[in-house]
């Protein structure tokens, strides 16, 4: 990538993305995040919020279970998203998965996300990006679609380039040797 291409790419990122981090050394709560996101919606017209990773947020446990806290947090975020017309994405990692008999890990789904079935129950769309380290292919598994006009459950495979960190379609391979068999 040339210097000009890099500068153009960085300009595009700065025009289309806002990175909100806790620079004061504290851990953000969901209320902190939604307050700052509300300001970004009104000042800059933000339409998408990605919380990555969710497990870096502070949750005031008190006497509630983690399951109840997550359920309440997801309800709060869902209500905020509807009020502000914003799509919200959570990057959430699964609880510990165990290898299957073939040596591979299962594809995590919504119920595998740590601490609560609410991740599955309250999501409008849920999907998993699952990398196969043997083939360097990535499987996108859509495990939930609440509203059918948004899509359907299924799986698609992509090629992953470790060097560039990019995904691409897997090219069709034409076997010209089929006549010689």
Predicted segments, located by residue:
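Conserved inter-motif catalytic segment of the P-loop NTP-binding fold
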Residues: 1-63
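C-terminal regions of RecA-like/P-loop NTPase motor modules
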Residues: 8-12, 30-46, 79-84, 96-181
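Hydrophobic/aromatic beta-strand patches that form the interior of the parallel beta-sheet core
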Residues: 18-20, 89, 125-127
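Hydrophobic alpha-helical membrane-association signature
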Residues: 33, 69-73
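Structural recognition of the conserved hydrophobic beta-strand(s) that form the central parallel beta-sheet
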Residues: 50-51, 86-93
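Active-site-proximal loop/turn and secondary-structure-junction residues that shape catalytic pockets
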Residues: 55, 94-95
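Short acidic, glycine/proline-rich loop/turn micro-motifs
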Residues: 59-64, 100-104
